[in-house]
Amino acid sequence: MGLHSEPLDQEDQDTIILDARAGDLDSLKDIFTTLVSPELLSTCKESESDSTALHMAAANGHIETVRYILETVSRANSAEDLKAFVNEVNKTGNTALHWASLNGKLDVVKLLCDEYEADPFIRNKFGHDAIFEAENSGKEEVETYFLKKYDVEPEDDEEDTQTEGKNSVQITKGTEIEQVTKEATEALREETEKLNINKD
């Protein structure tokens, strides 16, 4: 009897997603060698969020599970389909790289970027790319990796002249969120002033 090759129902997809989330590599290998065609791995999505098995394994730092998922999808699909899978977004616009970055999973981030050319500049629905997620969540090792690999610099960095010579790429920690906070504080202050004026 051959492997199942028809589209999977949601219950079966959720089982695969849960195995990826838990890093249950043995279960995934068993499923995709004895039960289900490997071509279907890239089609599995979590019902609530549209997150893939790759999202789940990457977010939790299960490096061997991530490697297995990528190798399986690579063997069973075209290079174009693999690239689309690596950069696939869920309902909130996050890629697997966003989640690995947010959680500081450096080994997973390196695997995704160095071997599978994951795009760190894809922005989610909040306007954040994977580099911002690493910085914003204080994952300095991941942030440093991104800054060195992609030679990115923060926008409007006024400390360039003071930090020159230390590294080729410098970033003032937290500047993006500081700016957003300043803008929000200013908007709130203006609204408060309007309310006070209206009371008089």
Swiss-Prot record:
Please verify whether the record's keywords include Metal-binding: no
**Would you tell me the Gene Ontology cellular component terms?**
cytoplasm; MBF transcription complex; nucleus; SBF transcription complex
Give the matching PROSITE patterns: ANK_REP_REGION, ANK_REPEAT
The Gene Ontology biological process annotation of the record reads:
cellular response to oxidative stress; positive regulation of transcription by RNA polymerase II; regulation of protein localization; response to osmotic stress; ribosomal small subunit biogenesis; ribosomal small subunit export from nucleus
Name of one Pfam family that matches:
Ank_2
**Polar residues composition bias: which ranges?**
164-173
Stretches forming ANK repeats: 49-78, 92-121
Look up keyword Phosphoprotein and say if it applies. Answer: yes
User: Which superkingdom heads the taxonomic lineage of this protein's source?
Assistant: Eukaryota
Q: Which residues carry this modification: Phosphoserine?
A: 78
* Stretches the record annotates as Disordered: 152-173
A molecular function annotated in GO for this UniProt entry is: DNA-binding transcription activator activity, RNA polymerase II-specific
Give the UniProt keywords, A-Z: ANK repeat, Phosphoprotein, Repeat
UniProt feature, compositional bias: Acidic residues: 153-162
Please share what else the UniProt entry notes about this protein: Present with 13100 molecules/cell in log phase SD medium.
Its biological function? Answer: Required for normal rate of cell proliferation.
Q: What is this protein called?
A: Ankyrin repeat-containing protein YAR1
